Regions:
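Conserved beta-alpha junction segments in alpha/beta enzyme cores
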Residues: 2-4, 9-130, 137-259, 263-267, ...
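Anionic-ligand-binding alpha/beta catalytic cores of soluble enzymes and soluble regulatory domains
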Residues: 290-293
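Accessory structured domains or lobes within enzymes
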Residues: 297-299
Length: 434
């Protein structure tokens, strides 16, 4: 018994509440972002290309999600899943935007892509990643305990197949580029989003933000982002599906657009409003509401030859400390042993006056409003997305940190004050790229 207690003692400790501005990682971030210089080179051109690659397995594989889905194979295919890519080039800088119909962009996939994506095509640091955050798509990509909790038994072939599809989508998009114009679109959809963390006590991010492209030959593409979680389909429904983003993308492509892409926005604490007779009716209703917002958006045309800059910066953090109780946490070495250790980073892409910032987490929609307003004072339209290729759990508003809730206990892995810290990270990027 004494030996057991000693072993347990080596694995647990108390939560560290040291203010983040007193921590070494904060100073490290300030040093990293301080070295970023705004790219002032004049654009000579603006071209865009897009492509998609079907990643639907030929036979059932484990799904990544929660509840009944956790590690179990899907039973039927409701709708196919894809990787989609948009490649943009202004004559000086080239970058890619990639979204996959997955729960997240898995760190295991990012690791493969860091070797696969080289300067010959588009290097990893010039690729902006996101996902639709469907909870009914391909698993098998998580190592250690993360596989047990989220994605089923680890399968390196699944990781390689996803990475290869992303690579091929970028190559295909790059091979078919045309001169194009760029626009920013913004509208509100207050009817299809709720605060699932604290209900009416908290706020929501109801903005539907989109980037539109139209080529000289009249082809149209649109990238849209919204904050409501892709959790319409219940966990007992064992189907492969993109959830409501799939219905949205298909509807946009059957209407005014030749190509559509969806990226989960600041989905932390944000849930959909489920209205309908069954899961699939609810998906259609949710997608219809978001689509109506997209189609009624205010449109801001960008410069014919927009400036462009892409950055990928390491994101320093305090050591991981996942909670066992609200005050007792696992030591960092236990977490790393159980979940693996992967690089963490923040990605940002500025195209004209549009600034996209990708975070390695479920980033809370409650944190976006002030950032959006701040960006507009700097002349920028901000789009914050989650699941950039790293993953650290949920980042929620700090005022909820001591609440015994799923997002703030089970999925809070890196200690206190991260709401404030991550907001500061994004403000620093706004300042540097404005």
């Amino acid at each position: 018994m004494l030996v057991l207690l000693l072993v347990i003692a080596t694995m647990i400790t108390m939560m560290d509440h040291t203010p983040y501005k007193q921590m070494a990682y904060y100073k490290e971030w300030k040093s990293l972002v301080g070295k970023v210089e705004k790219d002032t080179v004049t654009a000579t051109d603006f071209k865009v290309g897009w492509a998609k690659v079907n990643i639907t397995p030929s036979s059932p594989v484990p799904m990544a999600g929660y509840g009944n889905r956790r590690g179990r194979a899907y039973e039927t295919v409701h709708d196919s899943v894809y990787v989609r890519a948009i490649v943009i080039d202004n004559g000086h800088t080239q970058a890619a935007i990639v979204s996959a119909d997955l729960l997240i962009i898995p760190p295991t996939v990012s690791k493969v892509l860091q070797a696969k994506l080289t300067a010959k095509e588009i290097p990893f640091d010039q690729v902006f990643f996101g996902s639709t955050h469907t909870h009914h798509s391909i698993g098998g990509w998580g190592t250690g305990i993360s596989g047990l909790f989220f994605s089923g038994k680890y399968d390196p072939k699944s990781v390689e197949r996803i990475a290869d599809a992303i690579f091929q989508a970028i190559v295909k998009a790059k091979s078919d580029m045309e001169p194009a114009r760029l626009a920013y679109l913004e509208s509100k959809d207050t009817l299809d989003i709720r605060n699932r963390l604290v209900g009416e006590e908290g706020g929501v991010d109801s903005e539907v933000r989109s980037v539109g492209f139209i080529t000289e030959t009249g082809k149209k593409a649109i990238l849209s982002s919204y904050g409501a979680h892709s959790t319409i389909i219940q966990s007992r429904n064992m189907v492969l599906s993109r959830d409501y983003p799939g219905v949205l993308v298909d509807s946009l492509e059957s209407g005014r657009n030749d190509f559509a892409m969806y990226m989960a926005g600041a989905v932390g604490s944000m849930g959909p409003i489920e209205r309908g007779s069954d899961d699939f009716d609810e998906m259609k209703n949710q997608a219809f509401g978001v689509q109506q917002a997209v189609l009624s958006s205010d449109t801001i045309l960008q410069s014919p030859k927009p400036s462009m800059q892409m950055i990928t910066l390491p994101l320093p953090l305090r050591e991981p400390s996942p909670r066992l109780t609200m005050d007792i946490v696992l030591r960092p070495w236990v977490f790393k042993k159980a979940f693996g250790e992967y690089p963490l980073f923040v990605k940002a892409l500025r195209i004209g006056n549009i600034l996209m910032v990708g975070m390695p987490c479920d980033f809370s929609g409650e944190l976006v409003g002030g950032l959006d307003a701040y960006a507009k004072t700097k002349g920028l339209d901000l789009i914050v997305t989650s699941f950039n290729g790293g993953y650290i759990g949920y980042i929620t508003h700090d005022k909820y940190f001591d609440r015994d809730l799923y997002e703030t206990k089970v999925m809070s892995w890196y200690g206190p004050y991260n709401g404030a810290y991550f907001q500061e990270v994004i403000r620093d990027i706004i300042n540097k790229l404005s």
